[in-house]
């Protein structure tokens, strides 16, 4: 019998018949993934080996995904839920007293077993609950939900990291042919180096009908954008123009004064991107079925006058979506796709008001 804290190397090199994981939902996502990568060969090698996972929910993480997959019979785990009302002596009076001494949110998580994310999230909790997760077709780190279709228009939003383990380089591919838009593929890797990232971007973008690519160029993003455009010679890298106090606008890809490859993320562009992303998702104009994006959205919270990942969480995929939110608000993008989502949403809202007044 061995007792150990959960880490990537906790049981490596050992053989166990039963592995019991307590409060697994509270293990950080990156450690949980590394732990299962090392422990599963140990478990699968024995005919009678078992894994038991016991935990109260803690947002949308690896435990949440395993639980949902078990409920939908997408894995071989057996889900067992113990509700507070099944414990003798606990009734509505006990519930009211407990909420009074803690909080509604704590009670929902600890006793109702609700998978709540962080508070003050960009996307409302009620909307996050209704966002359905689909299983992707996996291929070398790229999660694919829809294969490219002829004559469809695709855009790719790219967020670049330094290639260190705590940060991910990521991109998300969107089908922009018509509203609602849809996430059709996503990639993220916390070890890919900026020198190699442009080759992966180019390969996937070409596959998706030579997708238009918009790269966030803060820090090492500029290097990735330059390599993609000038060394690999990928033509559909989007450019932005600086318009003084008006900020950046999406351009047509012609070089000139004030033009730059990619988007520089500033307070202004982030404010527009987050606001538009919220409108798109909550207005059902952007369909996201990727678990990792939804999980990041559940911990993407308000901090001061901005939005960022909650402590211990990441937001690389969400920032790709924020880039797309900014992009979808640009006049040049509407010309490329011939889809004015803001106009559609305004018309639908007006029709709803008129219907209520009728």
Where are the model-predicted features located?
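ATPase catalytic-site recognition across NTP-hydrolyzing enzymes
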Residues: 34, 86-160
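Acidic two-metal-ion nuclease catalytic site recognized across multiple nuclease folds
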Residues: 186, 324-358
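Structural recognition of the conserved hydrophobic beta-strand(s) that form the central parallel beta-sheet
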Residues: 2-3, 48-56
